[in-house]
Design a protein with these regions (language model features):
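Hydrophobic alpha-helical segments at protein termini of multi-pass membrane proteins
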Residues: 1-167
Length: 167
């Protein structure tokens, strides 16, 4: 049964469209805000930098320090405590990143257009890195499955039992 896994062309096309949408929408919003509200591209790129630095680098580093060892065992042993921890960490790191971006860039701001550009950059890079890259990964796995089944995926990723994809 598992050897006959395939992904329909429609599903692959939808994944590609979602990936394309996550790339086009932020750029489209940036162009729209730039034209309509005279927002400046500097703020778009500040938003694009803040999200990966604070969430994907600093927050991930904090998780690696806190989730391994005794504190991590306590957090991971209680679903409610772990959910509280995850929400708190996400909020703290994203808001600290936004605060720093606003604190450093308010002196250059010339109105709400700049804030809109920052939001398009911050949310846009989040969409691209999380949804867009996920779609790219899903398409890669789907094509591997369609070309050679699980053997092709194992050749690409290693034994499935070690990757957590197969119980």
């Amino acid at each position: 049964m598992l050897e006959s896994l395939t992904v329909t062309p429609t599903a692959i096309i939808i994944m590609a469209l979602v990936g394309l949408f996550t790339l086009v929408l932020p750029l489209g919003l940036g162009i729209f805000f730039w034209r309509k509200s005279k927002g400046r591209w500097r703020f778009f790129f500040i938003g694009c930098i803040i999200f990966p630095v604070f969430v994907l680098i600093l927050e991930r580093t904090a998780h690696s320090l806190l989730l391994y060892g005794a504190p991590g065992a306590v957090l991971q042993g209680n679903i409610w405590l772990y959910a509280f921890y995850a929400g708190l960490m996400a909020g703290v790191f994203e808001e600290c990143g936004r605060w720093l971006a606003f604190k450093l860039s308010l002196r250059w701001s010339q109105g709400p257009g700049d804030a809109l550009m920052y939001g398009a950059g911050h949310g846009g890079i989040e969409a691209i890195l999380l949804a867009g890259m996920t779609m790219l990964s899903n398409i890669t796995l789907a094509l591997a499955l369609n070309r050679g089944g699980l053997e092709a995926v194992e050749a690409m990723m290693g034994p499935l039992s070690e990757t957590g994809l197969l119980a």
